[in-house]
Amino acid sequence: MKHYDYVLVGSGLYAGVFAWYAVQNGKTCLVVEKRDHIGGNIYCEDVEGIHVHKYGAHIFHTSNKKVWEFVNGLAEFNRYTNSPVANFKGEMYNMPFNMNTFSRMWGISTPDEAKAIIEKQKAEVTGEPKNLEEQAISLVGRELYEKLVKGYTEKQWGRDCRELPAFIIKRIPVRYIYDNNYFNDLYQGIPIGGYNAIIEKLFENCDIETGVDYLEHRETYDSLGDTVIYTGTIDAFYGYRFGKLEYRSLRFESDVLDEENHQGVAVVNYTDRETPYTRIIEHKHFEFGTQPKTVVTREYPVSWQEGMEPYYPVNDEKNQELYRRYEELAKKEEHVLFGGRLGEYKYYDMDKVIESAMRRAEEIFG
């Protein structure tokens, strides 16, 4: 059988960027993917001529010029700007929190008026915030918290905000200007034609096997390569030796609607506790689509169980301590490197995953 320099387990962005660098440096790569397609969570499906983000909305944004130039070398990006809207019991608010939000909520028009209201409400919390609720109120005040943070966050994490640690929300962007651009980054956009074009370029000249669980055939695949790049869950790699790390998962429900424009924006967050989903995505708006039909996806957060897709690491102290024990094992591996959101048990935006893979590749290939 053919022998490879690298066996890459998983085919998301981390594996893809590493594979691209490896091939550029004359190395051979075999990709082993459990799903029936490559691309990890940025994979898109074509439905009615619309590129549907199968695993939730992915909006590329970065301030790293090197990363931006790298992805633009793989695909052309459009000028999509993320400007989601929050729906609280039928009241519509612009996100992130800015003068449009404050004007709608309080009927005010100046930054000084908004600041005065928020500062007064923030003062309710004195001393170090003991939980997420106190942390959020200390950042944005009671009213914004109750309407636009509390319900959404509790659905996301499946717990009351008073039971969640304060560090989950380090900051909440508050802008005293009329600006609905969600991200502060220098660059943002969506690849024209969807993310699949990027994935295909990253894995060009690699051999690929889909529908294969590496962990069930570990000895076979280990024997096929000099080094394994493992981007699956690190606890599963070690057979849950110290116990299972916690993740949050997502469930999606999609519908094709016989209308041209359902909600007028790509993302609407539902911030009340009673609506069971956290948001509705209308995919065509990511690429300014004019198709006669539209595709909408409702997103439901769920607790992760084995066999489900792990999306978000639950980076509380208990899980971080458990991860550190697995990390110690990983450091002793001579022929296995761990990377990506699951391999490093870290919440990564796309640009940070690319940065991480670039760093690793440059350490190895120079």
Roles of regions detected by a PLM:
Residues 18-27, 202-205:
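A short, Lys/Arg-enriched amphipathic alpha-helix followed by its capping loop at the start of a domain
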Residues 9, 23-48:
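Glycine-rich FAD pyrophosphate-binding loop
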Residues 1-14, 30:
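Beta1/beta-strand and adjacent pyrophosphate-binding region of the FAD-binding site
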